[in-house]
């Protein structure tokens, strides 16, 4: 059945209406969100026809994480950088694919007030097998005075974010974001080329029945995570256990499913990665901001993700994120094992 387009609220309309309720809003943040959406549409087009183009596979280089760079990673990175450069509201960009921040000299803009941190293509190891992948972004207000952005602008604690979101490229393409006033999801309607409000005021269920973790690393997990996984697998009628194990290997896809249905995603520190593996600034912080705005929790095993003081743009951390009661159950196991975990080196 065709929808009545007069009842559809596009992302542009939603952002414009929301801006009206913010005293003194300049519109700069709204423009950045729109620029990100434009880049996402272009990336979505290439993702959808990637199997028909010479854009799959390896690009040949290594990124700052010592991971092989895939062609679509490079393409996505270029699109976000181009969109944010041309917009004029962004003074610096930090990306998973770039060792250093990218300062932006905006001629004609006396003061560009924001910095954007991005993971251009999360889950890119799944590109070749047609599994859902995504992009993650985090936005901060600059702390330096003016001119091109500096490292200090990008190295802010997560609770200072002014906006964060992700785009998931799957059976449909969605953009989910927060500006600190709830979480809203928009689905790309290819017939009109616009993101349309499809999931207003998203809330993650307080309880869930899905746990997402790479159990291939079980032997390297801290004791409390091993015990929690055992708890998830143990039958119990009152708590509807055993829970379902669902792990895609794309953080955005796993997180998105758990946000909608309720669940927990875990990528803890391990013996091999004692400081964690996922990146704090452009993976964990933005998703932590979103989940808290949706009523969930995000911790690193010792405290709140959004309270971690960054020391490096590409800093890694463990993360446990999802439904409030499920994360708090992990915290209970952590408390029972205080002093016993040989892997916690922070």
UniProtKB/Swiss-Prot annotation:
It catalyses: beta-D-fructose 1,6-bisphosphate + H2O = beta-D-fructose 6-phosphate + phosphate. Its EC number is 3.1.3.11. InterPro entries: FBPase_C_dom, FBPase_class-1, FBPase_N, FBPtase. Its cofactor is Mg(2+). Its main location: cytoplasm. Binds 2 magnesium ions per subunit. Keywords: Carbohydrate metabolism, Cytoplasm, Hydrolase, Magnesium, Metal-binding. It is found in: Cytoplasm. HAMAP family: FBPase_class1. Belongs to the FBPase class 1 family. This is Fructose-1,6-bisphosphatase class 1.
